[in-house]
Curated annotation (Swiss-Prot):
Biological classification of the source: Eukaryota, Viridiplantae, Streptophyta, Embryophyta, Tracheophyta
Predominant subcellular localization, coarse grouping: nucleus
Name of the protein this chain belongs to: Protein SPEAR3
UniProt miscellaneous comment: Knock down expression of SPEAR2/TIE4 and SPEAR4/TIE3 by RNAi in a SPEAR3/TIE1 null mutant produces lines displaying epinastic leaves.
Keyword Transcription part of the UniProt annotation: yes
Keyword Heme: no
Annotated PANTHER family: OS01G0212500 PROTEIN, PROTEIN SPEAR3
Motif annotated as SPL, chain positions: 44-52
Organism per entry: Arabidopsis thaliana
InterPro entries: SPEAR
One GO CC term, this protein: nucleus
Alphabetical keyword list: Nucleus, Repressor, Transcription, Transcription regulation
Subunit structure: Interacts with TPL and the TPR corepressors TPR1, TPR2, TPR3, TPR4, and with the TCP transcription factors TCP2, TCP3, TCP4, TCP5, TCP10, TCP13, TCP17 and TCP24. Interacts with SPL and SPEAR2.
Function statement: Transcriptional regulator of leaf development. Acts as an adapter-like transcriptional repressor recruiting TPL/TPR corepressors to inhibit the CIN-like TCP transcription factors.
Length: 193
């Protein structure tokens, strides 16, 4: 059907202006359809493959934290929401949070710098970082930049030992061993992805 446009230069206009307008407008229309519409579609959001990666990574993070039997699952879900700075994160991906570089609009959560100071308990966790505890990096989607960013926080199981002074001498070694084992498992799973 596109070739019929080029075959009829005198379509309802004068002979001097019709060939120019009819030959330039189909070319212009073709560029608009193929050139500007197609690149805009991927820029609107994440692709299916990227969303699947994020979902799988979220399930992986959720499963790796739930291997600790001493941390009750219901309190873990509440604690992750506090750390993420987003009060109603769905349970399918609790380790992800939305962050924005502008003042926080309602659907996106808090500014990344403010997320660590969400409440007093969270502030204590971030300031008590001993040399033996390793920070955990959880990726989060930043809608203003269109990329994945990382935020640092210490694993809840590791900091629990440091917050209770009476248990510090008893469980310091076992807590670090548990963390190192989970770190080795995490590296193995990342290599498979």
């Amino acid at each position: 059907m596109g070739s019929s446009f080029f075959g009829r230069p005198k379509m309802g206009g004068s002979s001097s202006s019709s060939p120019t307008s009819s030959s330039s407008s189909p070319a212009k229309r073709g560029k608009n359809k193929n050139g500007s519409d197609k690149p805009k579609q991927p820029q609107r959001g994440l692709g299916v493959a990227q969303l699947e990666k994020i979902r799988l990574h979220g399930e992986y993070n959720c499963n790796s934290f739930n291997t600790y039997p001493s941390y009750h699952p219901s309190t873990y879900q509440e604690d992750v929401r506090i750390q993420g700075g987003y009060p109603s994160i769905p349970s399918s991906s609790p380790s992800f949070s939305y962050a924005s570089s502008s003042p926080p609009p309602a659907p996106y959560g808090f500014h990344p710098n403010m997320m660590m100071n969400a409440n007093n308990d969270q502030y204590e966790r971030t300031t008590i970082r001993y040399g033996d505890s390793q920070p955990h990096r959880a990726p989060s989607w930043n809608p203003s930049y269109g990329i994945l960013e990382s935020q640092h926080f210490v694993e809840p199981n590791t900091t629990r030992h440091f917050l209770h002074e009476d248990q510090r001498n008893i469980s310091l070694g076992s807590g670090i061993q548990n963390f190192e084992t989970s770190e080795a498992n995490e590296l193995d799973l990342e290599l498979r992805l």
